[in-house]
Amino acid sequence: MPNPNSICAKAGILIGGKSQRFGSPKWNAKIGKTSVLDRLWDVCSDFEKRVVVGKSKPNQIKKPFLSDLTASQAPIFGLYTLLYNSEYKWNLLLSCDLPLLTKNLLKKIWATRDDQADIILPNINGINQVTCALYNKNLIGEVEKAIKNESLSLQDLVNESHVKKIAVESWNQELTNMNTLEDWKRIKCKEENKTSN
């Protein structure tokens, strides 16, 4: 039966980072009994298509997987791989740095899209959330050009694109960033306390 809440877009979850500050693959870190990747996969369940994007597919991952088209490390390569392999106009680029993301926030981002824009971008206190944003498939030429010019910052791509920014200060908790083991321990503790109350 069709999902009435279905989002006509593709979600790409990036697992490709080296996680040097974290010390192990972030996607496999557990919060409660669930890995970060599984949490984000569930959060994206309203999207018509979901895929994991990374350098090479770990044996533990049984989900649909796209291998990056280049071995270089930067989220822009994951974005290029996602757009290149997508049949959808809109594509969510999502990193495993955001384990507390919710369906409601993704619905808000989707509901505020503007078909004249290249990127639909959440913004908290002036900080762009470039790895929790919708990217238009039409942007692929600009992404390719940026890669050729070795301009590998997604923020630089944002600065050169037609962007719709969404103020999401009230969603600060959902966009908590997990970069270090200390971040993970803090998030894990908070979530476990929430479920035990």
Sequence positions of predicted segments:
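Nucleotide and nucleotide-moiety/phosphate-recognizing core
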Residues: P2-S151, D156-L175, L181-E182, K188-E192
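Long, low-complexity, intrinsically disordered segments
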Residues: K194-N197
